[in-house]
């Protein structure tokens, strides 16, 4: 049984190597036809466009001012004074401050927390 398995393995290996040589020789002789991409027209419109810089930054991205952060309650938090600034979560007061000073990315409305309301 082991001998039969070894013989079949050897025959298969010889077959694989001989078929690779046929394909390689045909490729080198340019006998193979080029493969046409069927979906080439479909993806022609999906070519990547040049990326434009956003006017605001998401949480964690580097920015220099509160007005550069996207969310209404986002604030620009800087370490060591003015270095390593990034957008982090702020509060209602942050939103009011942005509403007064920002000309771009100005908040339309400031969300109020439901924690301070009395129930009952």
Swiss-Prot record:
Posttranslational mods: Contains 5 disulfide bonds.
Main location: secreted
Subcellular location: Secreted
GO molecular function: toxin activity
Propeptide intervals in chain numbering: 17-54
Keyword terms of this UniProt record: Disulfide bond, Secreted, Signal, Toxin
Domain of life: Eukaryota
Cleaved signal peptide residues: 1-16
Tissue distribution: Expressed by the venom gland.
Disulfide bonds: 56-70, 69-87, 78-85
GO CC, alphabetical: extracellular region
Domain Agouti: 56-95
Similarity comment: Belongs to the neurotoxin 05 (agouti) family.
Protein name (Swiss-Prot/TrEMBL): U13-lycotoxin-Ls1c
Organism: Lycosa singoriensis
